Amino acid sequence: MKQYKKFVAAAAFLMLLQSAHAQSDSTKTKPQFKLSVNYNTRLNYYGRTDSLRSSGVFPMAELWLTPKFYVNAAPIFVNNPLQSFDYAGTVATVGYQNVGTKWITSVYLTKPFYKESSELVQSALQAQSGVSLTYQNKIVNINAGGDVKFSDKVDYGTTAGLDHIVRIETKNKGVVVIDPSVYAYAGTQNFQRTYYKKNNSGFLLFPRNNQQVTEEVSRFNVLAYEATMPIIYAKGKVMLIATPSYIMPQNLITVPNRPDLSERGENMFYATLTAKYTF
């Protein structure tokens, strides 16, 4: 759910304002239930895509047990020339988020339940856990995070970013938050490398030959750069979010004559649209 986590700082800023208002006359906190509908114009995983230019719809249910602890679940429906609103699986998350005036800290554990027939680029992912830290100030917010991804192998990832939050109050007692941001993503990549090695066990009458060797390789590389600008409008219990983004995948894995083992990706614009209601 990378798209969801990108605007955590801006959404957390709004949560801080709403929480302060809601608790101004009471010290008790009640669980909050939230429902949202999200639409992604181009599903991707660090800029990696399928060959069908798929878009996705994922309704999300969130239960905030306290202002800091939450659980959520989001079924994912995929649209492309071959599929129309096809169910691909569900992603569930449990997490902790502490929003302060200077620091935002977050810890989460995500468990996907993808269909075996899912064509999503990230469908091999079995679980993911991560932490993030944001330092807020008036000039620029500094974001850093790390994660561990579990599939048939274990991969490690890091995120670094900068953003600047602009808050505008509207005449109808709403608020608009604009959060231009830039991010860099890095992580381990696992792939096979094939090369030829001289065979030194030849005899006098038989020439030495080359032996083909295939080995597993793991490298830590930059995965993508991204510029994004979440625009959030909130009034009362309603929140509307539009997040245009431009992502540039890096270090795509390519295997000669094996498109099934190669990564597909390109620099591209995409957007995530969200409508959320808090009960």
Predicted regions, residues:
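Bacterial Sec-dependent N-terminal signal peptides
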Residues: 1-26, 269-271, 275-279
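Short loop/turn motifs that connect adjacent beta-strands in outer-membrane beta-barrel proteins
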Residues: 24-31, 99-105, 139, 167-178, ...
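Short glycine/proline- and aromatic-enriched beta-strand/turn motifs that initiate or cap beta-hairpins
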Residues: 24-78
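Transmembrane beta-barrel strands of outer-membrane/channel proteins
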Residues: 35-41, 63, 73-75, 107-111, ...
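Residues on the lipid-exposed face of transmembrane beta-strands in outer-membrane beta-barrel proteins
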Residues: 37-39, 59-65, 92-96, 129-137, ...
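Flexible, solvent-exposed coil segments and beta strand-coil junctions
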Residues: 38-41, 70-75, 108-112, 136-143, ...
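Solvent-exposed loop/turn segments connecting transmembrane beta-strands
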Residues: 46-55, 77-88, 113-125, 148-157, ...
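Outer-membrane beta-barrel transmembrane domain signature
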Residues: 149-266, 270, 277-279
